[in-house]
């Protein structure tokens, strides 16, 4: 559909590849681990049935240097000692890891060709910035409430709906998306990451500020 609509972002090269698998292994249930490595970062957390979910995104140019996923993990991801330990102490539950290529974090339009985009169609946020599914539900909630309000007030028009949705989407998500892109770039630089973590550890309020600007506020209940 994106190709058929000739959306701007689809014309640009996608630079990311994602790899995901479930494992049997130990990891604190109350934590979500984030481990940077050359050209990407990895998230680790416990999910349903006490499974260990390990998912990482890596720049395509870095991935192409290696024969396969196993070599990439051993040569690149294992350079992070914490991540290496997790992999070596875990047992995979998948016959083959799940992969998604051509991932684009380029800016997208929330309204295109008079189509209201929700979820990833309106903008794909970096995984380090929160729950993409929650954002999809939230954007759908915004659309439904705008339509409901306009119909009840007998003020519905396509133009007004499109403008109102674009404005509210920008207010709710635009800053989070931008912050996510900046943080992802920082994670790709080991030196900057190391210095940044030390600063955040020294100033806890800064960490709360980052969380607020990447994860947003709770979805408000319908009035």
PLM regions and their residue ranges:
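Short capping/connector residues at structural and topological boundaries
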Residues: 10, 28, 39, 52, ...
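FAD-dependent flavoprotein oxygenase/oxidase catalytic domain
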Residues: 58, 81-94, 98-101, 178-198
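Alpha-helical elements of the RecA-like P-loop NTPase motor core of helicases
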Residues: 2-3, 145, 208
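Generic structural signal for well-ordered, non-membrane alpha-helical segments
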Residues: 12, 66-70, 108, 114, ...
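FAD/FMN-dependent oxidoreductases across multiple families
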Residues: 64-147, 152
């Amino acid at each position: 559909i994106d190709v058929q609509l000739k959306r701007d972002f689809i014309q640009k090269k996608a630079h990311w590849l994602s790899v995901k698998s479930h494992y049997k292994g130990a990891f604190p249930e109350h934590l979500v681990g984030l481990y940077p490595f050359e050209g990407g970062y990895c998230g680790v957390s416990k999910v349903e049935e006490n499974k260990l979910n390990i998912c990482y995104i890596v720049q395509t140019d870095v991935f192409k240097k290696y024969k396969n996923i196993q070599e990439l993990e051993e040569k690149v991801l294992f350079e992070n000692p914490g991540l290496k330990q997790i992999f070596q102490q875990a047992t995979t539950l998948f016959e083959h890891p799940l992969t998604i290529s051509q991932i684009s974090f380029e800016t997208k339009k929330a309204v295109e060709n008079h189509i209201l985009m929700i979820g990833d169609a309106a903008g794909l946020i970096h995984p380090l910035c929160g729950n993409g599914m929650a954002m999809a539900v939230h954007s759908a909630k915004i659309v439904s409430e705008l339509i409901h309000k306009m119909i009840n007030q007998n003020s519905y028009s396509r133009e007004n709906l499109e403008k109102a949705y674009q404005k509210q989407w920008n207010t709710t998500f635009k800053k989070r998306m931008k912050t996510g892109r900046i943080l992802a770039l920082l994670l790709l630089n080991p030196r900057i990451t190391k210095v940044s973590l030390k600063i955040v550890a020294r100033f806890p309020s800064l960490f709360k500020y980052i969380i607020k600007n990447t994860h947003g506020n709770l979805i408000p209940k319908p009035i």
